[in-house]
């Protein structure tokens, strides 16, 4: 599309709010932003819809599945779901099949994303077998390495990753749980007891100690913290930390009954008390980012007995609007923007997120009219514990100057996403 214009009711530039504003887009950049209407008919006119344009939303934690797990989700369906939810960039996790623990598997995943992604993307690698593989994978344009609880038993491999990440200037991301502290039945109302909060905080301390032992100082990020103590421990150690919408807004009592596997997720949903404290820490500014942990499965898998059903549920079609409807008033627009856009971009190292003259034309437009969560038909995961709950919706998604989605046309065709580390900022 040549130079074109989008107009909205409200536009947040990254430091101030404008009303009845238009952005003139030329190529992949915002040429100028102005208020007071537009002479003629804008190419994309979203006024009169309670529309709010923000610098593009980033999701630091998604599972697009793909490869041999494409029956759950794939790179096309997952990124289409992201576009429909106003997410402009996703960071894909490595626990697919084969797991992204070798350069060969990582190349296959990157090729699949290049062929099908409808939003921009980056990837985390798993913990490889050797330091040499870690160095090679760190040079392949990844966002960082992901450490899972089962990886923590091999500290030599962890130290290899810490060293390689520091050398390459990329992230080390930790799933904060320690398996050796799990106890009891791992399903239903007992999950938060079986996977206790102190297992989260202990894993953060363990990773900090491993980094100290090897003399490494990589950038460490703690993802999907479900407990207040995990957030506090992370900040104490100088790590960044994110939380998920489900840990902020759902409690075990609401959706994780003894026969209900739709709400089964790792780390588990907590009680009302932990959830309230986690929300308070978020409001107070201790949480750096919101990330979805979009973790799709087939419907038949989630109808299995809760003891064996896989953990996780889909979020990409809805989480920005769902979160904005519940949190934006409490934290303010500036803080909300920081947690879903600017700070994730800084942590991932993918360039600034702003919306004024000269900024990248990557824009999320939320519609601030309450609706209810429904299946939009993009993700392959046709279940969610938040079905029917109130939410804002996505009006439009623009990625590097191209319209990826509008609420009335849906997701546009073609693979338009690129590896975020290759975007010129």
UniProtKB/Swiss-Prot annotation:
Transmembrane segments: none annotated. Its cofactor is Zn(2+). One of its GO terms (molecular function) is dihydroorotase activity. Binds 2 Zn(2+) ions per subunit. GO terms for biological process: 'de novo' UMP biosynthetic process; purine nucleobase catabolic process. Keywords: Hydrolase, Metal-binding, Pyrimidine biosynthesis, Zinc. The keyword Zinc applies. It catalyses: (S)-dihydroorotate + H2O = N-carbamoyl-L-aspartate + H(+). Its EC number is 3.5.2.3. The modification N6-carboxylysine is found at residue 146. Zn(2+) 2 binds at residues 146, 175, 224. Zn(2+) 1 binds at residues 61, 63, 146, 293. PANTHER family: ALLANTOINASE (PTHR43668:SF2). Belongs to the metallo-dependent hydrolases superfamily. DHOase family. Class I DHOase subfamily. This is Dihydroorotase. It comes from Aeropyrum pernix (strain ATCC 700893 / DSM 11879 / JCM 9820 / NBRC 100138 / K1). The lineage of its organism: Archaea, Thermoproteota, Thermoprotei, Desulfurococcales, Desulfurococcaceae.
